[in-house]
């Protein structure tokens, strides 16, 4: 998902925070499959990188950032940026599909696992999701109607994608 975060932040012009968490992530031995740089080059849009570099601070092209403003003007500025945040879920989904195309790893904003007729669903994000998925599999074999919904994009939160992912 790190590659998805990098591709999406370049396209969306919105900063991303991508992280690994928890004891399991830092203390377990797991196999990893590296993505070949040549494959990555196939899905990176050079225009996105150029646009990113144009926005960087540069003494040859100075710009004014972070001015002091009254609340009314500050609020207008924050509202003007909403169009970028509103576009993020769609952009992240697009980048997830691109990464799937070169790796075969399928991700969605929310991934559901469990009974199609679940009566109870755990919503989780982070490294604990794998352990919960194993528990859900065992509980479903025992006749419980349960599931787990793994959150891949927390902010901006897509309520539409969340509801769509539920059974």
Language model region names:
Residues 4-8, 31, 112:
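A generic local secondary-structure boundary/capping motif
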Residues 7-11, 35-39, 141-143, 166-167:
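Short, low-complexity, polar/charged sequence segments that are solvent-exposed and flexible
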Residues 96-167:
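Thiamine diphosphate
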Residues 1-22:
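Internal, well-ordered domain-core segments that constitute the primary functional module
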Residues 16-111:
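Conformationally flexible catalytic loops at phosphate/diphosphate-handling active centers
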